[in-house]
Amino acid sequence: MTAIGIYGSAGRMGRAIADLIEIEGGRYAGGADASDDADALAVAADVLVDFSTASAVDAHLASALAARTPIVIGTTGLSPAQHLAIDAAAAHIAVLQTGNTSLGVTLLGILVREAAARLGSDWDIEIMEMHHRHKVDAPSGTALLLGEAAAAGRDTTLSAVRVDSRAGLTGARAEGTIGFASLRGGSVIGDHSVIFASEGERIELNHLGQDRSIFAKGAVKAAMWLAGKPAGRYRMGDVLGL
């Protein structure tokens, strides 16, 4: 039985994951938050799941690395330097980092990449996301994940074509860019729309998160899949065999 430890266990996602572990056939190895011993949890668990804060991820990754324990990182708002640290850690342990653990969003990312590859550059790509009023980062990790999928479909990088906001006299839209719009309000769990717009027609690919359990189920599935895997950086698509 896979023992799963949770960093950020007192948060919304941490609690939801803890409630599902035994239902999904795992064992809850315990949780750790800001004042708790991250090293001890890394030793006790077969695999770790991190849904804490971006500022805490470095310490949690170091604990996982020291204990040689695989880790699923679902925390969003990570910096480029943190992604480089994840790459370095993945040379020694199995790491799965994702902006969204929903199985539906994972499939959406594949559809977005395929659409971007098939449609010409005269199709503009815009990504719109909405979350609850308490979310602290924007665009969401999921929106960026979808943007990366679209950019990959066009054989480029998101950093080369990303436009985060428009205000005032911005001029005409530059061809090939990928735009983002972020909305915050109420208790929205997470809505994402990827819009492909051309002259005279528009395609919209949408995902609506209606229950936080979809992310918790995906996180537990990912953790149980990752346990025992060789060192490397994995993605949610690997969990689904996509």
Language-model features and meaning:
Residues 62, 75-96, 106, 111-115:
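Rossmann-fold NAD(P)-binding glycine/threonine-rich loop
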Residues 36-40, 56, 81-85:
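Short acidic active-site motifs
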